[in-house]
Amino acid sequence: MTIWVDADACPNVIKEILYRAAERMQMPLVLVANQSLRVPPSRFIRTLRVAAGFDVADNEIVRQCEAGDLVITADIPLAAEAIEKGAAALNPRGERYTPATIRERLTMRDFMDTLRASGIQTGGPDSLSQRDRQAFAAELEKWWLEAQRSRG
């Protein structure tokens, strides 16, 4: 099991939670980005730098993730592809994507893209709140406990 992070867009406060969790869980954490990242020294944490370009990091995560892994991303298409491979997907606000919810999220994303393309201002997401950080940490812990149970 590995935790994969779409690190270019992941908030620093979420990365900090992940660094602590990787140590505590003794689980590999891979941050994939198209720029250099500073991470704490750890045998569980590593970075994977990819070339700059549209979806390059996403494609690398999809290529390498496996069933049982966890992908941290706010990118709905990346989450959908990870789920197709049997990985779990969690966004930085603590929302766990599931096979049951990902289609709805893809449809909403496409609808919002259509609105933006027609010139309608849709605004962006609110900034990450303390409640979001707590929800993320709780959902990460829940995933880890489920993963431990399934490993036997």
From Swiss-Prot:
InterPro entries: UPF0178. Pfam families: DUF188. It comes from the Bacteria. Belongs to the UPF0178 family. This is UPF0178 protein YaiI. It comes from Escherichia coli O127:H6 (strain E2348/69 / EPEC). The lineage of its organism: Bacteria, Pseudomonadati, Pseudomonadota, Gammaproteobacteria, Enterobacterales. The gene is yaiI.
